[in-house]
């Protein structure tokens, strides 16, 4: 398992598909249901031919997916959380390092008979 960032598979067409087909409808559903949400919303996706499919939603960071993102954030992550908690995220400027980051997970399963 592992993750990398930035993901070259996410070109502008794919990004717009993700926003229009998944992210915006979720926010519209929150608004329609009068559901106020503050925090992390992790959307696990599979992408085939620039078309996203949702694998999972989580109200937490995904692991190992978050690891390369944290390496690339060039802003104070405390400020990100702080502005999120205050519901002033639009006042926050998230800056990214231009470098690529990769995380790799080595896992072993032992079966004892």
Stretches found by the model and what they are:
Residues 40-53, 92-107:
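Phosphate-binding site of ATP-dependent enzymes
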Residues 39, 76-77:
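Secondary-structure junction/capping motif
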Residues 111-113:
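Conserved small/polar residues in nucleotide/adenosyl-binding loops
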Residues 1-67:
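Internal nucleotide-binding/catalytic subdomain
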Residues 66-76:
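Helical (often loop-to-helix) elements that flank the catalytic cores of nucleotide-handling enzymes
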Residues 73-74, 80-83, 96-97, 103:
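Conserved, structured core segments of small domains
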Residues 26, 38, 81-89:
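Oxyanion-binding "anion nests"
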């Amino acid at each position: 398992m592992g993750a990398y960032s930035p993901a070259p598979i996410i070109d502008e067409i794919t990004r717009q598909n993700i926003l229009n087909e998944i992210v915006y409808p979720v926010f519209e559903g929150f608004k329609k249901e009068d559901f106020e949400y503050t925090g992390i919303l992790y959307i696990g996706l599979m992408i085939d031919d620039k078309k996203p499919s949702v694998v999972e939603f989580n109200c937490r960071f995904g692991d190992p997916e978050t690891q390369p993102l944290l390496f690339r954030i060039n802003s104070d992550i405390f400020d990100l959380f702080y502005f999120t908690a205050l519901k002033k995220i639009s006042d926050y400027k998230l800056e990214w390092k231009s470098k690529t980051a990769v995380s790799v997970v080595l896992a072993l399963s032992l079966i004892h008979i």
